[in-house]
Amino acid sequence: MTERVVLAYSGGLDTSVAIPYLAEQTGAEVIAVAVDVGQGGEDLDAIRQRALDCGAVESEVVDARDEFAAEYCLPAVRANSLYMDRYPLVSALSRPLIVKHLVAAARTHGGTIVSHGCTGKGNDQVRFEAGLGALAPDLRIVAPARDFAWTRDKAIAFAEEKGLPIDVTAKSPYSIDQNLWGRAVETGFLEDIWNPPIEDLYAYTADPAEPRDADEVVITFDAGNPVAIDGETVTPYQAIVELNRRAGAQGVGRLDMVEDRLVGIKSREVYEAPGAIALIAAHQELEAVTVERDLARFKRGVDQRWGELVYDGLWFSPLRAALDAFVNDAQQHVSGDVRLTLHGGRATVTGRRSEASLYDFGLATYDTGDTFDQSLAKGFVQLWGLPSKMSAARDARLGGAQS
């Protein structure tokens, strides 16, 4: 029986060329699977047909936009996930979902091999293959760009030789990956980290320096999840789309950073994530109002580790699942409204309210109505500082005073 290889298909040059190339190299039939995670651009029906025209025996397009929003993006919101305190995991979040659907296609179509278009230099090869190893360790993996030393010139020559129905002349100077959660741009002149990004790089956000009226938006959360915008009920997908539109129009969510890749190198990336940045900013503020101090302090470390695990391709790890359980439990009171002003590239919190708020006006005010018993403070301060006081006295007695 002829083997079948399931290919993660994007419709571009590299994965289109991979169809006949994989067939030649492995002798297998190729099943192309394109997963819609809100990347937009070309019509997915056209992408499906292109895969067939390039030699795939089956071609599937999976609409995973709602699933991506609810089951991958919202956990990132609840975990305030910003890798290196900045990057909202635009690409990293989509990879485990794509892996899930590749495995499903392999089971449906009798596939024994899975293929992706990642190089040996990036993070995505790890994300794909760690996920495949967790979900389907029986499937073999082939990565043409890495395993067969694939280059763009080689891909173009192969496409022309085979007469493949793809445009092999236009060449973007950048490598671009985009989805519902944001857009990532790298390579080209950006590899010189002194070069500033040019406006042509951006597609999800308007120039924040352009004068325009501010936009005020109220986001309603229930147990850490956005459920309404300006009082109108929204699904997770609708919330992200709407905030991408409104925050993007104000230039919110542009990031230019040098990040630490999993493979050990530093890489310069330019990101656009207007909806993600707005949602995380609002969620962080609502947590500040509703989450008890020690829980909030501990959760910050959990949030950081959660983001590192996802960035490093360990979505399917037991630790990520356990951290999710902690994060979700911590969200039971994170319900209420946060008002943001979107303007000049910033999402600024200007108001917050919650029935579960731990903010007590009477305790916080310095004016009339103060209910804080200041007579209790003196003894508290003395007891709080007692260990340090005793340690300092001991050091002075022994001649080893601390600086």
Curated annotation (Swiss-Prot):
<dbReference type="GO" id="GO:0005737">
    <property type="term" value="C:cytoplasm"/>
</dbReference>
<feature type="binding site">
    <location>
        <begin position="8"/>
        <end position="16"/>
    </location>
    <ligand>
        <name>ATP</name>
    </ligand>
</feature>
<feature type="binding site">
    <location>
        <position position="124"/>
    </location>
    <ligand>
        <name>L-aspartate</name>
    </ligand>
</feature>
<feature type="binding site">
    <location>
        <position position="117"/>
    </location>
    <ligand>
        <name>ATP</name>
    </ligand>
</feature>
<dbReference type="InterPro" id="IPR048268">
    <property type="entry name" value="Arginosuc_syn_C"/>
</dbReference>
<keyword id="KW-0055">Arginine biosynthesis</keyword>
<dbReference type="GO" id="GO:0005524">
    <property type="term" value="F:ATP binding"/>
</dbReference>
<dbReference type="GO" id="GO:0000053">
    <property type="term" value="P:argininosuccinate metabolic process"/>
</dbReference>
<keyword id="KW-0028">Amino-acid biosynthesis</keyword>
<dbReference type="Pfam" id="PF00764">
    <property type="entry name" value="Arginosuc_synth"/>
</dbReference>
<dbReference type="InterPro" id="IPR018223">
    <property type="entry name" value="Arginosuc_synth_CS"/>
</dbReference>
<dbReference type="InterPro" id="IPR023434">
    <property type="entry name" value="Arginosuc_synth_type_1_subfam"/>
</dbReference>
<dbReference type="GO" id="GO:0004055">
    <property type="term" value="F:argininosuccinate synthase activity"/>
</dbReference>
<dbReference type="Pfam" id="PF20979">
    <property type="entry name" value="Arginosuc_syn_C"/>
</dbReference>
<keyword id="KW-0547">Nucleotide-binding</keyword>
<feature type="binding site">
    <location>
        <position position="271"/>
    </location>
    <ligand>
        <name>L-citrulline</name>
    </ligand>
</feature>
<feature type="binding site">
    <location>
        <position position="127"/>
    </location>
    <ligand>
        <name>L-citrulline</name>
    </ligand>
</feature>
<keyword id="KW-0963">Cytoplasm</keyword>
<feature type="binding site">
    <location>
        <position position="123"/>
    </location>
    <ligand>
        <name>L-citrulline</name>
    </ligand>
</feature>
<keyword id="KW-0067">ATP-binding</keyword>
<feature type="binding site">
    <location>
        <position position="87"/>
    </location>
    <ligand>
        <name>L-citrulline</name>
    </ligand>
</feature>
<protein>
    <recommendedName>
        <fullName>Argininosuccinate synthase</fullName>
        <ecNumber>6.3.4.5</ecNumber>
    </recommendedName>
</protein>
<dbReference type="GO" id="GO:0000050">
    <property type="term" value="P:urea cycle"/>
</dbReference>
<keyword id="KW-0436">Ligase</keyword>
<comment type="pathway">
    <text>Amino-acid biosynthesis; L-arginine biosynthesis; L-arginine from L-ornithine and carbamoyl phosphate: step 2/3.</text>
</comment>
<comment type="similarity">
    <text>Belongs to the argininosuccinate synthase family. Type 1 subfamily.</text>
</comment>
<comment type="subunit">
    <text>Homotetramer.</text>
</comment>
<feature type="binding site">
    <location>
        <position position="119"/>
    </location>
    <ligand>
        <name>L-aspartate</name>
    </ligand>
</feature>
<dbReference type="InterPro" id="IPR048267">
    <property type="entry name" value="Arginosuc_syn_N"/>
</dbReference>
<dbReference type="InterPro" id="IPR024074">
    <property type="entry name" value="AS_cat/multimer_dom_body"/>
</dbReference>
<dbReference type="InterPro" id="IPR001518">
    <property type="entry name" value="Arginosuc_synth"/>
</dbReference>
<dbReference type="InterPro" id="IPR014729">
    <property type="entry name" value="Rossmann-like_a/b/a_fold"/>
</dbReference>
<feature type="binding site">
    <location>
        <position position="175"/>
    </location>
    <ligand>
        <name>L-citrulline</name>
    </ligand>
</feature>
<feature type="binding site">
    <location>
        <position position="123"/>
    </location>
    <ligand>
        <name>L-aspartate</name>
    </ligand>
</feature>
<dbReference type="GO" id="GO:0006526">
    <property type="term" value="P:L-arginine biosynthetic process"/>
</dbReference>
<feature type="binding site">
    <location>
        <position position="259"/>
    </location>
    <ligand>
        <name>L-citrulline</name>
    </ligand>
</feature>
